[in-house]
UniProtKB/Swiss-Prot annotation:
It comes from Pyrobaculum aerophilum (strain ATCC 51768 / DSM 7523 / JCM 9630 / CIP 104966 / NBRC 100827 / IM2). Residues 129-183 form the HTH cro/C1-type domain. Residues 140-159 bind DNA. Gene3D superfamilies: lambda repressor-like DNA-binding domains (1.10.260.40). GO terms for molecular function: DNA binding; DNA-binding transcription factor activity. InterPro entries: Arc_TR_HTH, Cro/C1-type_HTH, Lambda_DNA-bd_dom_sf. PROSITE patterns: HTH_CROC1 (PS50943). This is Putative HTH-type transcriptional regulatory protein PAE1627. SUPFAM superfamilies: lambda repressor-like DNA-binding domains (SSF47413). Keywords: DNA-binding, Transcription, Transcription regulation.
């Protein structure tokens, strides 16, 4: 199935952007690097999100923050359950989405729903919700009754303290419009914690890569991919060219 998804993804890249790098010889942390308009993306294609290991996630994050290229994982399912169109799955700040959702994103339609621990939710723009509720002449209690939630829940939506589950979010969208929700940004590099950096650090601003063509990545006044494997060296050079980095032999 991954071959079918990969071919479909490559068709989207061909029709909507430019393929800068690809290697499907084995499952690396990434499958390809693509460019859509001015933005480059490091992309992994897998049937299920569980096929992308935690070490691959760390590699993606390190590559992203050092090359300023966001990471996107294109998958069909999460833990065996179909990932719906318009819903993204966030794992350690790396975005997973279906190919249909990616197509929507490329057409300018940003996703608003996210999957977390089996529950689909949306982030509500609290200020807009409060303004539109007041414009409609609705009290907190009345809106809560219409939504089937407590007054306290609506109050917390307006303060941005909690996200709304799918059905409640859909009710709010029907009442006040889609701009009541916050769009999920997919063109930003994932956040990397100091603990994650420390777990991979092998030198000054140098970090080990475990599921990539280069063995490490470092930052001086530029991004450098470090290669000690002769068999992977050529692909490391191709990856560096795609991401605007340089290569250094270990």
């Amino acid at each position: 199935m991954v071959d079918k998804l990969l071919n479909a993804t490559l068709n989207v890249v061909k029709n909507r952007g430019e393929q800068l790098f690809i290697d499907v010889a084995r499952p690396y942390a990434y499958t390809l690097v693509a460019k859509f308009d001015r933005d480059k993306y490091i992309m992994r294609v897998a049937t299920d999100a569980e096929q992308v290991s935690q070490s691959a996630i760390k590699d993606l994050k390190l590559l992203s923050i050092h090359t300023n290229a966001p990471s996107i994982c294109v998958v069909s399912s999460v833990k065996g359950h179909l990932l719906q169109r318009g819903v993204v799955y966030l794992r350690d700040d790396v975005v997973f989405m279906s190919l249909a959702t990616l197509t929507d994103v490329l057409e300018g339609k940003k996703p608003i729903f996210k999957l977390n621990r089996g529950v689909i939710t949306a982030s509500i723009d609290g200020e807009k919700l409060r303004a539109k509720r007041q414009q409609a002449g609705l009290s907190l209690g009345t809106l809560a009754t219409n939504l089937g939630v407590t007054r306290e829940t609506v109050y917390r939506y307006e303060r941005g303290e909690i996200e709304a589950p799918l059905k409640i979010a859909e009710k709010l969208i029907n009442m006040f419009g889609e701009d009541i929700t916050k769009k999920i940004k997919i063109n930003e590099t994932p956040k990397v914690s100091q603990e994650e950096l420390a777990s991979r650090q092998i030198g000054a601003k140098t970090y080990r890569l475990l599921e990539s063509h280069p063995d490490a990545i470092k930052w001086e006044d530029r991004t450098i991919l470090i290669s000690s494997n002769a068999e992977r060296y050529q692909k490391t050079v191709e990856l560096a060219n795609a991401l605007g980095a340089e290569v250094e032999r270990a």
